[in-house]
Amino acid sequence: TDATEDELALTAWARILLEGTPIAMDGSWQLHRRRAAPEPVRFAKRFGGEQSNTSIMVGDAIIIKMFRRLEPGDNLDITVHNALNDAGISSVATLYGFMSGQIPAEEHIPVDLAMIIERLPQPRDGWELITAKAVDLVDVTDLVAGLGQCLRTIHEALRHTFSTVEIDGSRVADDMVRRLDAAVVTAPALARYRATLTARFEKLRGRHLAAQRIHGDFHLGQTLLTPGGWRIIDFLSLIHI
């Protein structure tokens, strides 16, 4: 039986993580608390939906996300949530803590095992929401404007939190023209815009451009609308742009 199917054991474990003083006797893992839990642990159970990780629902306000695929080093989702929380950004979930350990077979390389994060209240999937309104021909201008402002605030915080880099404008121009040509092959209707777009890309040549980290996989499926506004999730990758 998978240990995460035992709700009594899960509840006891969650209480140790969030309320007690957990100690790994063999030193194989550590708990890092970042912020106080919003409520006492009443119950814990495994989320039954299809997910890339194992999610444990702790009461109504917390999720423990256990990573199925372990990667050496810091988990980016943990790092970004912690940084944005510290910056006072309210459009991401609150990180309450995380668990880390070591991989003995890999010369004790550190690895993050799980994150303890806010369970967002009454979330509505952004993709399902916007597409449903599109089918009904409902104006979504205010909704998407709010989402855009939310993303802008996050990216501004990422610019201040993480270092910026300088990139070669000529290389960017080459890459954009190459992508445009590939897009024209796939969608010939774009051909009439090629000259105008290429002219814009050419203006980048010879310039040094400041680039910052942004959400590396942003789409409506990474957004949730809650009573408190838009929330953006899953910072599993960041790219410079």
State the predicted function of each range.
Residues 35-43, 179-214:
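An alpha-helical support segment within catalytic cores of ATP-dependent transferases
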